[in-house]
Design a protein with these regions (language model features):
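Extracellular and organelle-lumenal recognition/adhesion modules and their flexible linkers in secreted
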Residues: 1-207
Length: 207
């Protein structure tokens, strides 16, 4: 089994400007639905942890069931709006983190229904019913088509064009040269020329 202090997580942080419309930490908090396609060599129950940072950090878990090994299936989970803790930070601060739990030791597990928008004390990283994917030699886990939506309903995945995706990614990382060109410099008669390719305003402090 997984040791008491061992964790296997997929980590996804979000900035405040991406989440402030959820109005969490207020009486008007909205639900959040996460939908995705998943394929795992280890069937069973898995869990997703949502941590809401801000004034009074809070966390919640939702479980989903991988029914068959090595087969793609669509899943969705809905987190109720957090109206008591974790007022969203705005702008560039880390506001929310989604953890895809693939394994947690017994000291890091809790019942899904118990740990729902409570403070983050205890370092919980999985639910009691979750599989120990990390303890299976050669195990594989794949997700794609992840979509987060305001409200309790998951809709069809909204595809974006390649230029749109590139522009969004360049907020966090951008090559010093064009995408199709390897980074480097040119030298001519002692003159060294470099290029800084930054078409979009990059975030200076990645969460």
């Amino acid at each position: 089994g997984t040791a008491s202090s061992n964790l296997v997580l997929g980590y996804g942080p979000f900035e405040g400007w991406q989440t402030h419309d959820l109005a969490w930490g207020t009486p008007y908090a909205k639900d959040l639905t996460i939908s995705f396609w998943v394929k795992s060599s280890v069937p069973g129950i898995y869990s997703i942890q949502l941590i809401n940072y801000g004034t009074g950090n809070a966390q919640a878990f939702r479980e989903y069931h991988v029914k068959h090994a090595n087969a793609w299936q669509w899943c969705s989970v809905t987190f109720k709006g957090c109206n008591s803790l974790g007022t969203n930070d705005l702008y560039e601060s880390r506001s929310m983190v989604v953890n895809w739990s693939l394994g947690a030791g017994p000291d890091d597990r809790i019942d899904e229904s118990v740990q729902d928008w409570a403070t983050t004390g205890g370092n919980w990283r999985g639910t009691n019913d979750s599989v120990e994917w990390g303890a299976v030699t050669g195990a594989t886990f794949q997700i794609t088509g992840v979509q987060m939506e305001t409200g309790p309903v998951a809709t069809e995945f909204a595809y974006r064009s390649y230029p749109e995706e590139v522009a969004l990614c360049q907020r966090y990382f951008c090559k010093s040269y064009a995408i199709s060109t390897g980074p480097g410099t040119n030298t001519n008669a002692g003159l060294r020329i470099g290029r800084n390719f930054d078409p979009n305003g990059a975030r200076s402090d990645v969460p």
